[in-house]
Amino acid sequence: MAAAIRHDWQHDELQALFDLPFPELLFRAAAVHREHFDPAQVQVSTLLSVKTGGCPEDCAYCPQAQRYNTGVNAQKLMETDAVLAKARQAKAAGASRFCMGAAWRSPKDRDIPKVAAMIAGVKALGLETCATLGMLSGGQARALKDAGLDYYNHNLDTAPDYYDSIIHTRQYQDRLDTLEHVRDAGLKTCCGGIVGMGETRAQRVGLLLALATLPAHPDSVPINKLVQVAGTPLHGSAELDPFEFVRMIAVARIVMPRSMVRLSAGREAMSDELQALCFVAGANSIFYGDKLLTTGNPESERDLALFARLGLQPMAVQVDAEGHDHGGTVHADISADAPGCGCAHAA
């Protein structure tokens, strides 16, 4: 019988999980995964930057911050037709969810109708919709919900006690407030963080504790591995031990058993073997395509080959224009013949 979903985890409990011998931790995580999901099914999503660069914030990892010299130039919000063309390509390539990211601190009210038109158009294609636009007011969240948005991404980024080492232009409470607005609007939440930014294991525990003790567990939990970009303050940071990354995936799966745990930014640099360990540990979602906002992602052909080697299949989903989920009725095609959320790190 599946264990009860908990929101009262304690730091020492999560620390004890992190500290388990690696084989024991993977065994426990895989067992929890099988209680709630088919371990051979992986959700496939595509992420598009609909407004790149020029962000006024100072997130130390982000090449889209205008204060850093990273070679990322500010661009205007894309036209709806161009976004829908990308969404059609993503669907043809096998994506079941289409995420749109904009490098804003928060959208202006005048931006919402433009984004709403993108959302409605993508939903009409039969794709799940996700957006990451920065901080939202309650009214903005409701407007996006009315347009047909399914998921909103807003990451916590790191543990509360490490946050001030990474970001100074937005408070941790600001992030929690946006998540509350998103939940109150009836949107599903996509919320995770980034590891490999110089934090300690105890602070990685702190990030997962913050996520697992939210009023509702995020529907999707993206775990990003820092992509170091020249010009950002975190460029040159020590690399995170790959096994530590797998531990992060495994503990996320155990404490948030019904959430989709997504391999997000940093996957381009991961070996097939490391990704396979992550799938065993409970990861069941990836971003598919060659770019995540402004950073690389594995080439589609590499993903196809890895899925074939591991016997994995894309998760089946079909969403109609009214937002009804008909999971299991249509299988996405990511065969090699198929045509080919915001900051640098994935939604």
Swiss-Prot record:
The keyword Metal-binding applies. Gene3D superfamilies: Aldolase class I (3.20.20.70). Binds 1 [4Fe-4S] cluster. The cluster is coordinated with 3 cysteines and an exchangeable S-adenosyl-L-methionine. Binds 1 [2Fe-2S] cluster. The cluster is coordinated with 3 cysteines and 1 arginine. InterPro entries: Aldolase_TIM, BATS_dom, Biotin_synth/BioAB, Biotin_synthase, Elp3/MiaA/NifB-like_rSAM, rSAM. [4Fe-4S] cluster binds at residues 55, 59, 62. Its EC number is 2.8.1.6. [2Fe-2S] cluster binds at residues 99, 130, 190, 262. One of its GO terms (molecular function) is 4 iron, 4 sulfur cluster binding. GO terms for biological process: biotin biosynthetic process. Residues 40-258 form the Radical SAM core domain. Pathway: Cofactor biosynthesis; biotin biosynthesis; biotin from 7,8-diaminononanoate: step 2/2. It catalyses: (4R,5S)-dethiobiotin + (sulfur carrier)-SH + 2 reduced [2Fe-2S]-[ferredoxin] + 2 S-adenosyl-L-methionine = (sulfur carrier)-H + biotin + 2 5'-deoxyadenosine + 2 L-methionine + 2 oxidized [2Fe-2S]-[ferredoxin]. Its cofactor is [4Fe-4S] cluster; [2Fe-2S] cluster. Keywords: 2Fe-2S, 4Fe-4S, Biotin biosynthesis, Iron, Iron-sulfur, Metal-binding, S-adenosyl-L-methionine, Transferase. It comes from the Bacteria. Catalyzes the conversion of dethiobiotin (DTB) to biotin by the insertion of a sulfur atom into dethiobiotin via a radical-based mechanism. PANTHER family: BIOTIN SYNTHASE (PTHR22976), BIOTIN SYNTHASE, MITOCHONDRIAL (PTHR22976:SF2). HAMAP family: BioB. Belongs to the radical SAM superfamily. Biotin synthase family. Homodimer. This is Biotin synthase. It comes from Stenotrophomonas maltophilia (strain R551-3). The lineage of its organism: Bacteria, Pseudomonadati, Pseudomonadota, Gammaproteobacteria, Lysobacterales.
